[in-house]
Amino acid sequence: GIASLNRYGLLKRFLLSAVWVLATALLPMYMMGVLQPIVLWQYSLMVCLSCCLFDARDAAKDARHQVRTLANRIRSSTFHTLMYGLVLGYWALAYQQHALDGVVIIRGIAALLCIRYYALCSAYVFEVAINGLLLFFALTQLFV
């Protein structure tokens, strides 16, 4: 079950991200007949970023419970560099498709703000910000 999956924190994040992308992006796109691989990759990067930020928030607790995650296995500066790299990758995919518009830039800025300030806010604000980031991405995808 989930208890045994906690020992494999890296795998857990991958599986959670994959299921989230499958349920909230791939299946709806497929059902509507508008499957766009680049958009799917962009969404995957944002979901991965969100999962990694959740890991970072719980890194000390996970380390005490011997749960290995990306956030507690590498230095904080390396972790932040990887998170910023995900946002740059998101922008690069949009640029490659000539779709680097205001919405994409605002999404990336929102992600950068979450990366920058996740450790400084309360647990409640953190939950709202990260889940809000995913909701913001999904809603702007629907209406753009």
Residues of each region from the PLM?
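Solvent-exposed interhelical
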Residues: 47-87
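Helix-coil boundary and interhelical linker segments in multi-pass alpha-helical membrane proteins
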Residues: 24-41, 92-101, 141-144
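Hydrophobic alpha-helical transmembrane segments
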Residues: 14, 37-41, 80-81, 105
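Helical transmembrane-bundle signal
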Residues: 43, 47, 87-91, 134-141
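Transmembrane alpha-helical segments that form the membrane-embedded catalytic/substrate-channel core
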Residues: 1, 22, 42-59, 108-119
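Interhelical loop and helix-boundary elements at the membrane-water interface
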Residues: 1-20, 67-79, 115-143
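Transmembrane helix-loop-helix
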Residues: 1, 81-129
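Hydrophobic cores of alpha-helical transmembrane segments in multi-pass inner/ER membrane proteins
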Residues: 19-31, 45-50, 136-138
